[in-house]
């Protein structure tokens, strides 16, 4: 078998050898093939290979293609990095010198002074040379690649005339919205010139293309929100529901000087027909409460409520568990659960009625709390709640009321709820809100009163409905 295959291949090669003269009898075709091969090699060396070499060996790439834009850009970026290094070192040295002078340190004297001057002059010369090198390289890039946004930005960075810088930065952004340095420079420039519409346009670009820069962009948007003219433009932009709207409201409280600025912005959005969602309100209300600004937080929440809810508002919000909780401080909020579920479920015995339904799985349960912040004035009150269910546990559930700013100060609590309760019954407990600043607001919560891990085992289900809070006569 092997012998037959070998003989077959030998006959093929022998036939080719006998007919190889066909390549020599037509020198024109042979020459044409040679020229085509050389042309292809030239294309590879001057077009394809420089792209491969440019990131790691720009000098070799430029030797093959002297005007290759990618290699020129790599060299320009290296020069820029060196220039930034020199500028940073100079800034640090100047700040150190000023710090020494402020502490009363003696200036350098004697033979060291000429060396310092010479070193400073040499760094200044190097910076000047680097700027010129970047300018030349960027110009060459644009000759070969007029749409290169990065080259326009490099040119802008080595210019000194503000109008020229502004023009070049605009050209960079016009060619690519992902040229973030140019976008941010223009954002800052337009902000300081009070061109708020252009500032918002550029902020929109950055927040869409570079969300990681939101901390820096939000500082500008926060200041625009505090300007009457800027706020109107910002409201219009937010009403269009940009993708970064929730991020904006989450960061806004940390980027304003006046505590009422977010509220004024939200009220304006509400008036424009695009009110903030509960998720957008929550960071602001939580921020106010963390600063112990309880009354401003409650006032803000009231102003952002729909008109129809204000007319039926009582001391407890949503006392019959009819609407889905928003998670806001003055509404029901549910903590993270493990092996338990909480829902506002329909009641089978009441048409269109709902109740709080809690079910526990078998095993250890994490049931942090169902909670709501109340604003009760000092005095005596009575709280009632309907309850039924079956709970098997060492320690059961409690309703507890405490002072918001000192939650260890328990005002009142129910007995532990556990065992079997097949039919609805009403729980009642009286309490008194003290005249102390820490109790300006109160914290009502339903919790599993477990004191240790071994007491976290609970099973069963429970229903609650119709919380009623009434003030008693003094």
What is each model feature region?
Residues 119-127, 138-142, 149-160, 219-225:
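Alpha-helical adaptor scaffolds
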Residues 78, 124, 158, 188-189, ...:
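Residue-level signature for tetratricopeptide repeat
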Residues 73-74, 150-154, 180-188, 201, ...:
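Alpha-solenoid helical repeat scaffolds
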Residues 64-68, 145, 176-179, 210-211, ...:
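A structural motif in tetratricopeptide-repeat
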Residues 11-18, 23-62, 66, 73, ...:
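Extracellular and organelle-lumenal recognition/adhesion modules and their flexible linkers in secreted
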Residues 58-62, 92-100, 128-140, 164-173, ...:
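Alpha-helical repeat scaffolds
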Residues 82, 128, 159-162, 193, ...:
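Structural motif corresponding to the intra-repeat A-B loop/turn of tetratricopeptide repeats
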């Amino acid at each position: 078998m092997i012998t037959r295959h070998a003989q077959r291949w030998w006959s093929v090669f022998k036939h080719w050898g006998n007919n190889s003269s066909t390549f020599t009898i037509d020198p024109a075709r042979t020459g044409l093939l040679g020229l085509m091969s050389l042309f292809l090699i030239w294309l590879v060396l001057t077009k394809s290979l420089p792209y491969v070499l440019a990131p790691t060996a720009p000098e070799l790439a430029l030797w093959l293609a002297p005007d290759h834009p990618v290699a020129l850009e790599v060299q320009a970026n290296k020069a820029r990095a060196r220039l930034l290094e020199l500028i940073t070192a100079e800034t640090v040295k100047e700040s150190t010198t000023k710090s020494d002078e402020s502490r009363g340190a003696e200036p350098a004297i004697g033979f060291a002074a000429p060396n310092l001057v010479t070193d400073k002059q040499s760094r200044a010369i190097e910076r000047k040379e680097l700027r010129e090198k970047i300018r030349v390289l960027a110009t060459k890039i644009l000759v070969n690649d007029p749409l290169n946004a990065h080259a326009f930005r490099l040119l802008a960075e080595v210019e000194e005339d503000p109008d020229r810088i502004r023009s070049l930065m605009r050209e960079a952004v016009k060619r690519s919205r992902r040229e973030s340095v140019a976008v941010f420079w223009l954002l800052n420039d337009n902000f300081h010139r009070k061109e708020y519409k252009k500032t918002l346009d550029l902020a929109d670009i950055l927040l869409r293309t570079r969300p990681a820069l939101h901390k820096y962009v939000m500082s500008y948007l926060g200041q625009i929100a505090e300007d009457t003219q800027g706020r109107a433009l910002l409201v219009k932009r937010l009403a269009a529901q940009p993708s970064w709207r929730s991020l904006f409201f989450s960061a806004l409280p940390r980027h304003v000087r006046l505590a009422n600025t977010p509220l004024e912005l939200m009220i304006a959005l509400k008036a424009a027909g695009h009110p903030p969602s509960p998720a957008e309100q929550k960071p602001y209300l939580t921020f106010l409460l963390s600063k112990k600004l309880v009354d401003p937080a409650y006032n803000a929440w009231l102003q952002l409520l729909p008109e129809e809810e204000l007319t039926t508002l009582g001391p407890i919000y949503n006392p019959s568990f009819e609407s889905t909780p928003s998670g806001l401080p003055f509404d029901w909020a549910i903590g993270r659960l493990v092996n338990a579920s909480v829902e506002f479920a329909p009641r089978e015995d009441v048409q269109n009625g709902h109740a709080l339904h809690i079910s526990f799985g078998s095993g250890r349960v994490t049931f942090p709390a169902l909670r709501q912040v109340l604003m009760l004035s000092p005095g005596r009150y009575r709280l009632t709640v309907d309850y039924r269910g079956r709970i098997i546990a060492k320690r059961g559930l409690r309703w507890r009321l405490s002072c918001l700013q000192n939650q260890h100060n328990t005002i009142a609590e129910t007995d532990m709820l556990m065992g079997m309760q097949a039919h609805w019954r009403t729980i009642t407990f009286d309490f008194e809100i003290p005249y102390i600043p820490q109790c300006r607001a109160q914290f009502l919560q339903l919790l599993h009163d477990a004191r240790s891990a071994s007491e976290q085992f609970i099973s069963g289900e429970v229903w609650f409905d119709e919380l009623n809070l009434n003030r008693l006569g003094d």
